[in-house]
Amino acid sequence: MGKRLLDKLWERHVVATNENGLDLLYIDLHLVHEVTSPQAFEGLRLTNRRVRRPDLTFATMDHNIPTKDVWNITDRIAKQQLDTLRENCKQFQVPLADIGDEEQGIVHVIGPELGLTQPGKTIVCGDSHTATHGAFGALAFGIGTSEVEHVLATQTLWQRKPKAMGIELKGKLPQGVYAKDIILHLLSKYGVAVGTGYVMEFYGETIHAMDMEERMTLCNMAIEGGAKAGIIAPDEKTVAYVKGRKYAPKDYESIKKKWSELYTDLDAVYDLHISVDVTDLAPYVTWGTNPSMGVRIDEKLPEKYDANDERAFSYMGLSPGQSTYDIPVQHVFIGSCTNSRLSDLEIAASVVKGKKVKEGVRALVVPGSQRVREAAMHKGLHRIFEEAGFEWREPGCSMCLGMNPDQVPEGEHCASTSNRNFEGRQGKGARTHLVSPAMAAAAALYGHFVDIRKESYDGAISYS
């Protein structure tokens, strides 16, 4: 029987196996940020240990930094965490993309754009959405703080091998429908626990047609379906994306051959298989308090509901059977590790060019990294957004989570391109609706959700 992509990635990294069936995996890349690393570094300090492979470790500041005035950090805890990361990286000789550095940005944005993320690697980070890097054919997953310490000290991690789920995506995406809508559709249909104990492998003609940034969006939210990770076999688009980046391999031809071996064999069998035709897919909007509580923009909110739905309706201030078009939007956030890359900003800019944000709506665009920000400004996207009435910010996690100054006031609704809509995720009492960049941009113009498929934009932008 053939091997799945998961099998090939896993077997290449097993150092040892214990009596409980756990495998000790070698870790090729460890990404670090300011929130989940302080206790891990302190653990090394208390036991007089060093970081075993600082050359395979890379740190950045993203969660706590303000995006409006990055040099004016007023929150005491946030400043302490940022200062602590800076001190730890200096003491343990870990490379750091500090505030103001040209390489700084959201950890899951800078990894790929710097060429740190590569096919065949095992990648970990003390962050749930490490699955993003699986878009490159890497086995990437989030870990806890004690595991962060273990990897810092040993460059290994004990893990139990997950099962493999194959998700085949067939057909061509309609105009106005994106990778974000695919994953929201999957979550609404199969729930937030379907992937528990699995690694999701996305494949099929739809995947082949996607660019790398769309694939990253898809893998980013595999964790929202309960999966350990999301992966996509590398192809010519993967190779072209990685080639020439700062930390990309120099022996390109030899490494390219190794990457070409990373795929699921034709005679391999998944532990669970799902097939979805995307041809008739529509833009999605979440209405509740987990990412599976979503509907097509042309559907009404569910009439039948259970106790969890009842709580969600109450928290969100919505009613069963309500039209998605009637959901008010007071805030719009375009950013996060899900949708803050250049192509995301281009799509949003193409929607708002020459138009104005609805009076009373606060709209933010937060690029995922300094490099994304610079590239967007080179193309004039910042002017398009600012002329429309958006705030153009510095890179950071921003409004994705309520642990920095960018928050949604209690009881107000936000159209967000982020990945989680839990209670209080964007601030106490904040009401989060997950959507694609195109849908978020359109909501900013109207002050409520609209069907982007009916708007006059072509998904591409003219910079004239």
UniProtKB/Swiss-Prot annotation:
SUPFAM superfamilies: Aconitase iron-sulfur domain (SSF53732)
Uppermost EC category: lyase
GO biological process: L-leucine biosynthetic process
Origin: domain of life: Bacteria
PROSITE patterns documented for this protein: ACONITASE_1, ACONITASE_2
Residues binding [4Fe-4S] cluster, per UniProt: C337, C397, C400
Cofactor(s) this protein requires: [4Fe-4S] cluster
Record pathway: Amino-acid biosynthesis; L-leucine biosynthesis; L-leucine from 3-methyl-2-oxobutanoate: step 2/4
Enzyme Commission no: 4.2.1.33
CDD domains associated with the record: IPMI
Swiss-Prot/TrEMBL catalytic activity: (2R,3S)-3-isopropylmalate = (2S)-2-isopropylmalate
Sorted UniProt keywords: 4Fe-4S, Amino-acid biosynthesis, Branched-chain amino acid biosynthesis, Iron, Iron-sulfur, Leucine biosynthesis, Lyase, Metal-binding
InterPro entries: 3-IsopropMal_deHydase_lsu (IPR004430), Acnase/IPM_dHydase_lsu_aba_1/3 (IPR015931), Acoase/IPM_deHydtase_lsu_aba (IPR001030), Aconitase_4Fe-4S_BS (IPR018136), Aconitase_4Fe-4S_dom (IPR036008), IPM_dehydratase_rel_enz (IPR050067), IPMI_cat (IPR033941)
Cofactor binding, note field: Binds 1 [4Fe-4S] cluster per subunit.
Molecular function terms, GO-annotated: 3-isopropylmalate dehydratase activity; 4 iron, 4 sulfur cluster binding; metal ion binding
Keyword Hydrolase appears in the UniProt entry: no
PANTHER family in the cross-refs: 3-ISOPROPYLMALATE DEHYDRATASE, HOMOACONITASE, MITOCHONDRIAL-RELATED
Family, similarity comment: Belongs to the aconitase/IPM isomerase family. LeuC type 1 subfamily.
Annotated function: Catalyzes the isomerization between 2-isopropylmalate and 3-isopropylmalate, via the formation of 2-isopropylmaleate.
Quaternary structure note: Heterodimer of LeuC and LeuD.
Protein name, per record: 3-isopropylmalate dehydratase large subunit
Organism from which the protein derives: Bacillus cereus (strain G9842)
